[in-house]
């Protein structure tokens, strides 16, 4: 019964289909049933692809197939959605099969071959490339930078300037290990600063160099040598100048000049370099026997203070030396200074040898000098000089010089200071006091007087002073009158002359 029903239905279906087909042929159209029966190629293709998408689950696959059945006209859209969902659900391991673009592939290859990245760093960069291929260039740049920063120190590739700096710093002898390593690390961190780092390293190396190893330029070396040999600098001064030379060699000339100036200022007085005229005066004054130490030192100090007046100072010193010379050293008897008294050696004393007979001089009789009586000189009585009384000089009282007696007034209450005079000497010679003279002349310091200065003196010389000078005019032999001695010598000379004359007559 059941089979009959099925058969009847089939027959009915065939009949209906036949009628429909006939109708379509007559009317020239296609019925919806015929359209649904004939799936186009797009639907079939979509149906096939959806069935083979590995990443869709059963529900997703059945849903897409049902949609294809429900509306075959949407086959292309349904297939696109199915592919998108399938790709999004693809396993990670399968993502390596993605076709990377050219930049991504290059970055991927370079990162895999970077030797200084560890596995974690390398995998991180590769994952970044997979996640966003559009950032391949940036990811590769970061990977390179990290790879270079982690490169072993010995493997760093320095450019030419960096290599030169690296080599020089390694061979700087005055840097310690910490300083050397610091400069090398700075070179690695920023090679572009190689020149600046090398300059700093050189400066530090030179500043720490041992003193004997410093390389001075020619001017600096000369200054260094001269300062070391300046004898009047102490150690502190010498070391100070040498340190200044090291700190700033450009100032070598100025520093040497300062050092020389200080050396000269500290030179011992005896070592001063006087010019020729000054040296001569210095030598002569040192050997003037009649100067006191105070006078000698005063003249020497004057020479040092003003070498240009060396001649004048020497003349004053000689004059003072002569004035203070002992009487016996003036070739005069005590109290005289003209070499005219008998007993002198000026070709006037009887018995002298001037290619003349004994006792005679210049055709004069024995005992006479220049047609004058024995004991006289130039028409003066014995003991006189130039028409002056015995012991006088140039019309002055005994013991005077140049018309002024040392320590005595000029007869008008004024004393002219001579070289070597002191206020005390002047006061003593004039019977007054130094304080009185200082007060009368308003002297700020009674020890400060100079040759040629005029001083007012109130008191005259004591009367007994002239008598003492007269006594000094006598010869040191104790004779009261030189005329007797002269007469004796004259008589002997006459006798000797007569004997010689008689002998010559006999020969004739």
From Swiss-Prot:
Q: Which cellular component terms (GO) are annotated to the entry?
A: extracellular region
Q: What's its membrane topology?
A: Peptidoglycan-anchor
List cystine links.
Answer: none
Q: Is Aminoacyl-tRNA synthetase one of the keywords?
A: no
Basic and acidic residues composition bias: residue spans: 318-412
Signal as a keyword of this entry, yes or no, is yes
Prosegment location in residue numbers: 478-508
Cellular location of this protein? Secreted, Cell wall
Q: Which InterPro entries match?
A: Ig/albumin-bd_sf, LPXTG_anchor, LysM_dom, LysM_dom_sf, Octapeptide, Protein_A_Ig-bd, YSIRK_signal_dom
Question: Where does this chain carry the motif LPXTG sorting signal?
Answer: 474-478
Q: Which residues form the LysM domain?
A: 413-457
Alphabetical UniProt keywords: Cell wall, IgG-binding protein, Peptidoglycan-anchor, Repeat, Secreted, Signal, Virulence
**Residue numbers carrying Pentaglycyl murein peptidoglycan amidated threonine:** 477
Which family does the record assign?
Answer: Belongs to the immunoglobulin-binding protein SpA family.
Q: What is this protein called?
A: Immunoglobulin G-binding protein A
